[in-house]
UniProtKB/Swiss-Prot annotation:
PROSITE patterns linked to this entry: SAICAR_SYNTHETASE_1, SAICAR_SYNTHETASE_2
Organism of this sequence: Wolbachia sp. subsp. Brugia malayi (strain TRS)
Species classification: Bacteria, Pseudomonadati, Pseudomonadota, Alphaproteobacteria, Rickettsiales
Name under which the protein is recorded: Phosphoribosylaminoimidazole-succinocarboxamide synthase
Pathway(s) of this molecule: Purine metabolism; IMP biosynthesis via de novo pathway; 5-amino-1-(5-phospho-D-ribosyl)imidazole-4-carboxamide from 5-amino-1-(5-phospho-D-ribosyl)imidazole-4-carboxylate: step 1/2
SUPFAM superfamilies to which the protein is assigned, alphabetical: SAICAR synthase-like (SSF56104)
GO biological process entries: 'de novo' IMP biosynthetic process; cobalamin biosynthetic process
Family: Belongs to the SAICAR synthetase family.
Enzyme nomenclature, EC number: 6.3.2.6
Keywords: ATP-binding, Ligase, Nucleotide-binding, Purine biosynthesis
């Protein structure tokens, strides 16, 4: 049973208050959504799988020198994380053409990009998370120029680490969505937030290009839980 002190509910997680004002609990739900919540389902066990995968990836990134909000795993569904002031942007880095990128630029799905492309999206469900450029980011004060450059540098480093991590598991990292924030006691420290799991990465089998991410649900391609379990297995993530 969840405690009463839920301070935020997202599509896939609850954020829960703790006695420490500098930390919160991130609770992984079994809900899965697509198309701005137009498609919805509860898949038993999805939250526990994502918790374990994200824990493994956050620990890998910390070892690589990336500052993340992750502190420790508390249970099969819960993580203790730093409390952040979330920056209202989603940063997407693309390595292979897929999804909306193909529609916007009339590019065939699966085309390998010559270099990683970074895109910014304004986090606003009511506006359907519109794509924005760097001038928008500066104009609305979401980031300073220096912070924007820092986030781009961090994003490329994360992408590089994860490309290698997944490649060693026989998986191509097609694209990746990241969120960042600032600790409430240090407004200058850009910190990786949220989760990294098949919910917010596109992951394809390197040889067959079989989808192993939320597109399985989005596009009705089969059993989402089986796909996520396959990712965990290939990464040697322990689920119990």
């Amino acid at each position: 049973m969840l405690p009463d002190k839920i301070i935020y509910e997202g599509k896939a997680k609850f954020i829960i208050e703790t006695k420490d004002p500098l930390t919160v609990i991130q609770y992984f739900k079994d809900e899965v959504t697509a198309f701005n919540k137009e498609k919805y389902k509860i898949i038993e066990g999805k939250g526990t799988i994502n918790n374990r995968i994200s824990t493994f990836i956050m620990e890998t990134l910390e070892k690589a020198g990336i500052n993340t909000h992750f502190i420790k795993t508390l249970s099969e569904r819960e993580q203790l994380v730093k409390k952040l002031k979330i920056i209202p942007l989603e940063i997407v880095v693309r390595n292979i053409a897929a999804g909306s990128f193909c529609k916007r630029f009339n590019i065939k799905e699966g085309e390998k990009l010559a270099f990683p492309i970074i895109e910014f999206f304004y986090k606003n469900d009511g506006l359907a998370d519109p794509m924005v450029n760097e001038n928008h980011v500066l104009y609305f004060g979401w980031l300073s120029y220096e912070e924007m450059e820092e986030i781009k540098t961090i994003t490329i480093k994360i992408n590089t680490v994860l490309i290698d991590l997944f490649l060693n598991a026989g998986i191509d990292l097609v694209d990746l969505k990241l969120e960042f924030g600032r600790p409430i006691n240090d407004n200058t420290k850009i910190t990786l937030a949220d989760e990294i799991s098949p919910d917010n990465c596109r992951l394809w089998d390197k040889n067959t290009h079989k989808k192993l991410d939320k597109d399985v649900f989005r596009l009705n391609l089969g059993n989402l839980k089986e796909a996520y379990l396959e990712v965990a297995k290939r990464l040697s993530v322990k689920l119990c």
